[in-house]
């Protein structure tokens, strides 16, 4: 009710008479009668402010090593490493550097029926007339035993895990070497700068005749 009555008042006449009064400064009155600037809601302000996780992430990015950018660009993913190892295995098999095995397919994954397929290929039942004796049927069983004993010790997953660990160790070693070399170079440059500053100060002392023996470089 009060708000509605206040809006219905004829404020234009009162406002003009108030401004035409000579006892007061009109500019000051106009400045006082102006509405305050619009203030945004507190929820909008809070939404626009960055969260604590954003600050923590920025602070973490500043503290990261110089290797971070190079690591993201050059580090091999698991799929890339698996593809590389599979291609290397294929090349070695083509050059007959490693024997072919049916336990693993071309992608390097282990087959579930590898043992049964090897056994079915190696064992030949004495059904033909040429293999009437039992000794001929027992002979291929020894080859199955030899193949099972000569089974590879590492699968593709084991080789991939070993390569990942070796790459990680190599990365740590390179980082340590780089930090040592960088620290040594910075120390040498600092010593050269201190020596240069001392020589300049001594030459200035000799030319001007002033005594700077108690300077901050002493």
UniProtKB/Swiss-Prot annotation:
GO cellular component, one term: nucleus
Region Disordered, annotated ranges: 96-150
Taxonomy, superkingdom: Eukaryota
Keyword Cell inner membrane among record annotations: no
Compartment(s) of residence: Nucleus
Annotated GO MF terms: DNA binding; transcription coregulator activity
Record keywords: DNA-binding, Immunity, Innate immunity, Meiosis, Nucleus, Transcription, Transcription regulation
UniProt entry tagged with the keyword Ion transport: no
Tissue: Localizes to somatic tissues throughout the body, including muscle cells. Expressed in lateral epithelial seam cells, the hyp7 epidermal syncytium, and multiple head and tail neurons.
Subunit structure: Interacts with hda-1, a component of the NuRD complex. Interacts with let-418, a component of the NuRD and MEC complexes. Interacts with the transcription factor ceh-18. Interacts with ima-2.
Family membership: Belongs to the akirin family.
Function: Molecular adapter that acts as a bridge between a variety of multiprotein complexes, and which is involved in antifungal innate immunity, development of the muscle and sister chromatid cohesion. Plays a role in antifungal innate immunity by acting as a bridge between components of the NuRD (Nucleosome Remodeling and Deacetylase) and MEC chromatin remodeling complexes. NuRD and MEC complexes bind to the promoters of antimicrobial peptide genes and may recruit other proteins such as ceh-18 to control gene expression in response to fungal infection.
Name listed for the protein in its UniProt record: Akirin
Organism expressing this protein natively: Caenorhabditis elegans
């Amino acid at each position: 009710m009060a708000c509605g009555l206040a809006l219905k008042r004829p404020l234009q006449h009162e406002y003009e008479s108030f401004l035409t009064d000579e006892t007061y400064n009109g500019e000051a009155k106009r400045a006082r009668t102006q509405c305050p600037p619009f203030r945004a809601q507190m929820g909008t302000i809070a939404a626009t402010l960055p969260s604590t996780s954003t600050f923590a992430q920025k602070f973490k990015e500043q503290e990261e090593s110089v290797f971070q950018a190079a690591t993201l660009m050059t580090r091999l993913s698991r799929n890339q490493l698996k593809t590389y190892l599979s291609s290397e295995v294929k090349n070695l098999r083509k050059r007959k550097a490693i024997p072919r095995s049916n336990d693993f397919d071309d992608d390097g994954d282990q087959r579930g029926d590898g043992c049964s397929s090897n056994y079915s290929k190696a064992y030949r039942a004495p059904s033909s007339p040429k293999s009437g004796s039992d000794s001929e049927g027992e002979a291929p069983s020894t080859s199955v035993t030899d193949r099972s004993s000569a089974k590879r010790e590492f699968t593709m997953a084991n080789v991939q895990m070993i390569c990942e660990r070796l790459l990680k160790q190599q990365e740590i070693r390179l980082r340590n070497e780089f930090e040592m070399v960088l620290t040594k170079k910075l120390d040498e440059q600092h010593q050269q700068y201190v020596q240069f500053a001392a020589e300049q100060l001594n030459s200035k002392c000799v030319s001007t005749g002033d005594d700077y023996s108690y300077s901050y470089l002493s």
